[in-house]
Structures are given as structure tokens and as C-alpha cells.
Amino acid sequence: MLGEKIKNLPEILPMSGASVKVPTFSWLKITGLDTVLGPEMKSTGEAMGHGPNFGTAYLKAMKGGNKKIPTKGTVFLSISNEFKVEIVDLANRLKKLGFKLIATKGTASHLRASEIDSEVIWRISDKKSPDILSIMREGNVNLIVNLPTGKRAATDGAQMRRLAVELGIPFITTITGAKAAIQSLEEGENDYLMPINKL
């Protein structure tokens, strides 16, 4: 197909730009299903994007899957201890992009120790106000990054993720997804178009 034998090809083939493929989900059609990803198949399709760099390709793929990463507004962070070291860098990058950060008490405390400001929002199970559900219903959060562990976190997270689906608020449940989304905001070109004959 390439006009050469495999043994004669270079180890790294010359490439132009980057391509990203993302799964698509029909969460709204599956009532009551927790939207956190696991080993079972929940994807109902996929979308692909191509661009001059990873960020642009990722943005295009997300658009193709009818998902939009916000470019401004408020990001809610609820991060398990396992990812608290990595989230410091990501939170700093979100701040530099102009986002306001709100977070659960534990996550906010960890960010504060690294001199990153965030507003504390109560966990749902704390039964105090304001909690994340009320903030979401008021339209005051644009993106949710929820990396949970533990039974209470899973229960809180399930309610929050379900409401996010119903309200159309983008949410991320993996550290890899969070890194990809932030990189796409840093280097992605939203209006980038490539002629199909250049692919």
C-alpha cells in the first residue's frame, strides 16, 4: 500500500500535523447510568479531528463528537489524593488561561498550599450550601474536572455527573482527559480549516 517493503521504511514515517479520535456517548438516552468511565463499553460511536498540532486536532474531534471545551468561565475541581500532585500544574495552567477555580475543601486546601486561589464549594454529602449541584443549576460552572476515589466520592460524583449531562455542562473524569483538554485550550486553533486534499 505504501509502495515499499516494511523493512525499507524508516522507523518514524514523516507526518503532517496530528489526528485525534474520541469516543462519543449517548448519556441522555441511558437514564440513570453513571457517566464515569470503566472497563465496560459505554461508547456509541467516535469522532476524529485533524490539525497542525495535537491541541487543534483534539478540539476538532471534540466538536465532531458534539462536545465543546469552554474557553472561559469557571472550572470546578474535585480531585482524589492520587492526582493531587498533578492537578497543581493543571490548575496553574487553567488560571493562566483566565479561568476562575472552585473546588471541594480538600482540593482547595491542596491548591492553597501551592499558592493557587480557589473558592471552596461543599461536597453534596456535607449537606451544606452552596454545594456543586446548586452552583450547576444556577449556571455558574462551565467545566467540571472530577477524579474520584472512595465510596462517598463515587456517590457524590455520580449525582454531579448525571446533572452535568442533563444541563449540558462538559465534564472530565480522567487525568489524561484533563491534560488533553488544557493542552487543546493552550495550543488549539478553533477556526482552523484544512482542505480535504491536503490530508
Each language-model region and where it sits:
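ATP-dependent carboxylate/acyl-activation modules
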Residues: 1-172, 178-181, 188-199
